[in-house]
Amino acid sequence: YVYQAMRVTGAADPTVSVKETLKGKLPQKKLVRGAAHGYSSYGNQIGLATGLVKEIYHPDYVAKRMEIGAVLGAAPRRAVIRENSDPGDIIVLLGGRTGRDGCGGATGSSKVHTEESIETCGAEVQKGNPPTERKIQRLFRREEVSKLIKKCNDFGAGGVSVAIGELADGLRVDLDKVPKKYAGLDGTEIA
């Protein structure tokens, strides 16, 4: 089960005057406070304690901040099985529905951002679903559930194709059957 989280961030000096903010960038104070609030709010909704918070202040983060988050989990050895996948195994997608948000996130975090990029890159930030994630955490605490799972993977920034593709050497996935947040998305957009 997931039992705690950690957060490591890098920002420039948040006490610097707003007048010294780089053109096209938000003030460091706003970034630092907003990120801390967002992380805290999300963790509270999921029900996780954040055991480690480390904020690094350095001038090299003035143009692009660093934000790293992780959750830690544990399970009794007897509740975890590791088996190879077999033909006919069922793949279950568990969690929130898939949307355009988050698509391209793996590469988007490394892009050069400008005043105009907010129009095209905002969708690369995945919009989570804390209540659903909390239910999944509670489900995985049940040993009778965890013993049914041969392999498990999170979607991460790679999306459906990467997450499922890492489970077996060869498989077919009908991307049009993936539960979606809204109508109009086709398989090629979420792959």
PLM features: residue spans?
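Glycine/proline-enriched, intrinsically flexible loops and inter-domain linkers
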Residues: 1-191
